[in-house]
Amino acid sequence: MCFATRRWFYLHLGCMMLINLVNADFEFQKGVLASISPGITKDIDLQCWKACSLTLIDLKELKIEHNVDAFWNFMLFLQKSQRPGHYNVFLNIAQDFWDMYVDCLLSRSHGMGRRQVMPPKYNFPQKITGGNLNVYLRE
């Protein structure tokens, strides 16, 4: 008898959980994704953050001001929008940003990015090919 009542209880519990899942408010999840822990902000590499933000404005050809604040205000607008298409665009841009940001951090930590950030010590000629001529320029 105990087995039957336990089974009946779990059946009701499972049905209630399914009903709650169907009626769930996913706006709460958007709010959780938007919150940034204060401890995380000091760990952000601002140079990579700014470079990736500005690069995404150019790559995605966004019709916003060409600065970091405008980009992130636009991202917040997309995230908090009630239109599902806006949230999908937000997720795509956020994924692209994250990929670029991680690549930037890895290249800087391995020294590849430092070569671009620091001023050049030596002035090596760069080869520019134009037609059949090979021209060497010093910048």
Swiss-Prot record:
The modification Methionine amide is found at M112. Keywords: Amidation, Secreted, Signal. The keyword Lyase does not apply. Transmembrane segments: none annotated. Residues 113-139 form a propeptide. GO terms for cellular component: extracellular region. Residues 1-24 form the signal peptide. Its main location: secreted. InterPro entries: FAM237A/B. It is found in: Secreted. The active form requires C-terminal amidation and disulfide bond formation. May be capable of activating GPR83 via the GNAQ signaling pathway. This is Protein FAM237B. It comes from Homo sapiens. The lineage of its organism: Eukaryota, Metazoa, Chordata, Craniata, Vertebrata. The gene is FAM237B.
